[in-house]
Each structure stands twice: as structure tokens, then as C-alpha cells.
Amino acid sequence: MRYVFHPEALNEYAEAVQYYTEQRVEVAQAFINAIEDTVYRIREAPTRYAAIDEDVRRCMARKFPYGVLYTIEQDYILILAVMHCSREPGYWKSRK
């Protein structure tokens, strides 16, 4: 199934990559790989992950404190947020 990033989710992802790049390029690459793996797992089995708010589901990234929040649309997956787990819960709700 194809996927689309909400523009604000794409910005969050880019900001996180930038942050990790400033720490170490290797860490940034590991983060990119972790998010790509998370999106792959979502695409393989989108209904596997629990709904956290109505039709919004969350899949946690491995080795990083981030979750990918998404909805399953008719013919694609909409990624609503690439959320750091210590960020204010629910900030992404207006994106649905």
C-alpha cells in the first residue's frame, strides 16, 4: 500500500534528522533507517498496530523514542506525525 506524509509530519521528520545530524551523522542515518523500517512495517500490515485515537494508529520506531502515527485511507496510508514520545500528546489531532 502506498503512503503519503502529511506536510507537518514531513517537517517533523526533517527536523529530527537535522537534530541527529548535528549530533553525529551516523546517528542521523540510524534514525532515518529506523523510520524507514517503521514505515515498511506499517505498509506490510497496517492494521497490526493499535488505534490510539479513533482511526489513528501508532507504530513505534526501534531504538529511537519516536512513533509514527497514521490513518488507513481507502487506497493509501496517511502519516500524520513522526512524534517524539516526550512531546505533548495530541498535538497532531488537527491533522486528521
For the regions a language model picked out, list residue spans one by one.
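Arg/Lys-rich, positively charged N-terminal/basic patches that mediate binding to nucleic acids
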Residues: 1-32
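Short, conserved catalytic or interaction motifs in soluble domains
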Residues: 22, 47, 84
